[in-house]
Amino acid sequence: MPELSYREAVRDALVQAMRVDEDVFIMGEDIAEMGGSMGVTQGMLDEFGPERVRNTPISEMALAGAAIGAAIQGMRPVAEIMYEDFLTLATEQIVNQAAKHRYMSGGQVTVPVTFRTQGGSGWSPGAQHAQQLEAWFVHIPGLKVVFPSTPTDVRGLLWSSIYDDNPVVFFEHRTLYGIKEEVPEELEPIPLGKARVHREGDDVTVIATGRLVHEALAAAKDAENDGVSVEVVDPRTLQPLDEAALVDSVKKTNRCVVAHEAVVRGGFGAEVAAVIQYQAFDWLDAPIERVGAKFAPLPFAPVMEKFVVPHANDVLDAIRRTVGRDGN
């Protein structure tokens, strides 16, 4: 099997979709000659030309609106929002237009647009280039929200997002672009709404997203030294959410930790905790633990950034608390 980085897997999904379907095109700020801020689309201009690899003005609302219009007319645009923080500038179009047209038209109008964006900590980007805003969009009926954590998943889920007839907000974490793994020779679409169990265990379920999937896996290895068997589950798709997979795991382990890089208060983990509380309360042997960033803008200074966002040791501490081995 070939080995691809997360970045290469994103590009591969885009290239393959554009090769087989002329209705698929990409657009965004500096995505053509420059290849985007993270280099994901490098070389695609040479193969597909400026009509299908379209640089846009520096206006997220304008590029989102243009992408939505193209989708309504039957195209399948993939619009890159350079930084996740800049989704705030496109929110009117994504939330009030893309998410609403299918409902308002009684299903007569579909909006098959994918909004790719990236964010997160790890390289000291500062407070305005590193937010994790997935919870905002999970709250909006009509949107699908995807957050892959591995090259295999990002490739298969991006393909499925492009060919979904609903608008998808597709989150990528910048620190994952360099990770590599073997992927299937042929691209295998992954259905939206299906979670993935990365590691099986018996004592605690850790439900994690994005970068925190990898932190959770590291914490699970450390927990073995305590004699604790940890199951790590990645929802992959935040909306629709594979509630059954999450609940089944917690019913097996009887304990749950929810981890994400976004701020804890109001984060996606609160919704996951509510789902577990409603559907698996009688199986819980301990309170649900939540892990996330502190309630503060992300600092520019690397040492302060590391202090604000969660890491493997924070997940491990939560695991120990939920099994009663935190030393207290």
Where are these regions (language model features)?
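Thiamine diphosphate
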Residues: 1-167, 171, 306, ...
